[in-house]
Amino acid sequence: INGNIISAVKVSPYTSHLVYFGTDNVSAAGCRLVKVANANAAITETNISAGLPTAATVSCINTGTNDNNLIVCFSNYGIQQIWISTNGGTSWTNIDGDLPDMPVRWCMFAPGDNTKAIIATEAGVYLTQLINGGSTAWIPSPTFPTVRTDMLQYRSSDGIVAAATHGRGLWTQPILSL
């Protein structure tokens, strides 16, 4: 996308043929976040990067309970890493709060709840019980190892969250025990 390499993709689970793309920051313009409508035909591309960091790589994009609720995270040091939108990417709010300065590799809202989030970081899994802008309080998960974690997935059939780590394997926990 405009000279950048795609680093994250999210297909909307709510709207047919709607896809979000995040990029790295190799171009002079820095990283981008793009919403593509009509991905199966004559696409409509909308840059939804305004207000987001440019000196980083988009590591993950996820939706909440609808396409208006978005969470995006960045992988770099010295930047604000986690952002949410409640209006489909028109505007963004940083929710780093008290999170240490480290890359965030994956982010997701808690299933069915846009006020809670779970993230995978350079130092393990963190969660918040209340997204509250710059006052968001992040807690390291006691049930996952303190090691670089690259991806999280939620399995709705049994309420399990899986965390893929770098060097410690795959860990699972019920969402309620996080």
What does each model-identified segment do?
Residues 2-6, 53-58, 96-108, 136-156:
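Conserved blade-ending motifs and adjacent loop-strand segments that build the rim/top face
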Residues 11-16, 63-67, 109-114, 155-157:
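Residue-level detector of Asp-centered blade-edge/turn motifs that repeat once per structural unit
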Residues 25-26, 39, 76-77, 123, ...:
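Residue-level signature of beta-propeller blades and closely related beta-rich strand-turn architectures
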Residues 30-35, 81-84, 124-126, 169-171:
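A short loop-to-beta-strand structural motif that recurs across blades of beta-propeller domains
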Residues 36-38, 64, 85-86, 92, ...:
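Conserved Ser/Thr-centered positions that define the repeating blades of beta-propeller domains
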Residues 40-46, 89-93, 133-139, 178:
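Beta-strand initiation motifs
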Residues 126, 140-178:
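Blade-level signature of beta-propeller repeat domains, shared across WD40, Kelch, NHL, RCC1
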